Amino acid sequence: MEERTALRELAQGGVLLTCRALESGWPARSLTRALRAEGWARLQSGAWVEPGRAADPPTRLRAVQLLNPRLVVSHRSAAALWRIETLTPTTEARLEFIDPALSFRGKVKDVRVRRTPLESGDVALRYGLRLTSPLRTVADLLRSLPRDDALVALESAVTYRRVGGARRAPLVALDAVMAALASPSQGSARARRWLGLCDPRAGSPAETVARLRMADARLRPESQVQLFTPLGRRVVLDFLFRREGLAVEIEGYAYHGTREAHRRDVSRFNQILQCPEVRSLLRFTAQDVFWNPDRMTAEIRAALLAAG
């Protein structure tokens, strides 16, 4: 009996292609029995994930790319790999690819393939996957996404951010994005107009959307304002309506559940109210920003009117 290569040895990044196992000498019937007996999970037709490995987006991307090597991970899928924030949770988004050969005609569930050319500088390698570069990724998102989502991605990419528990440096420069959008491709003209709304100082997706909602309501505060308390302590506000002395703070999704975190929050807000420029303070959660923006802007407007 011919000795067979172990299935795990044939896997690539935890993904086994059926065709690879068959080519190595596994009979089809024996292969199916072995996959089920060992606990492999089917990702899609022709691809399996090894036992104990989650079928997460990177693993699913790998399966699609192994089956279709010419495809390049792109758009929101590439953004997630570069740790560029968007408004769509990675687990809910379709897998997105570009086919630079313009020849892909297949259909895969929960996968979108765009047929468009790519320059050599548009493609990078990360985690063993071929994907669009940060610059190309941001340009594609600006061309294809709605305004708020596009600007969340842009502002995430041009500044330092903590994403997934790790801090990363800026990935692109704003002038490089502007140059990348200079060509007359679909969506570029609209994207160039949106560049004027970008604030590289934004610290989170919630801050980006809050600022856009305020702008839509004709409320235009200063953002990321540095102030000092009478004791010389530095405080950076999310937003400040300086004439009215109104500070606006946006809290992220993370729940500060520890006693020490709560103490720091209380101390920070006390320090804000000690600043001579601040006479009142409004705090909103990310949920307020995303789900009740009209109420948020109404409260801000009422506070501004009360301040005279």
Features from the language model and the residues they span:
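Short gly/ser-rich loop at a beta-strand->alpha-helix junction or flexible surface loop bordering the NTP-binding
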Residues: M1-G187, G308
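Surface segments flanking catalytic/ligand-binding clefts of nucleic-acid enzymes
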Residues: M1, Q12, G25-S30, R161-G308
